[in-house]
């Protein structure tokens, strides 16, 4: 079971990505996780996956 609270989930997912997996998709497949559920929870808290950095991070809003 993975954490459902956004900040705990963020920490958990980023730790797994850093320590074990080359991509978010690989992690979800290997751990039998629903990627859409994770994306929805983290997006709702303002986080997005950066494939280049292989981690979730805060979305940056552009100032006009």
What do these predicted regions represent?
Residues 32-61:
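Short, charge-rich amphipathic interface segments used for partner binding and complex assembly
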């Amino acid at each position: 079971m993975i954490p459902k609270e956004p900040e705990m989930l963020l920490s958990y997912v980023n730790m797994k990505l850093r320590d074990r997996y080359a991509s978010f998709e690989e992690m979800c497949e290997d751990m039998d996780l629903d990627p859409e559920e994770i994306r929805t929870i983290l997006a709702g808290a303002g986080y997005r996956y950066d494939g280049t950095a292989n981690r979730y991070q805060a979305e940056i809003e552009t100032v006009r």
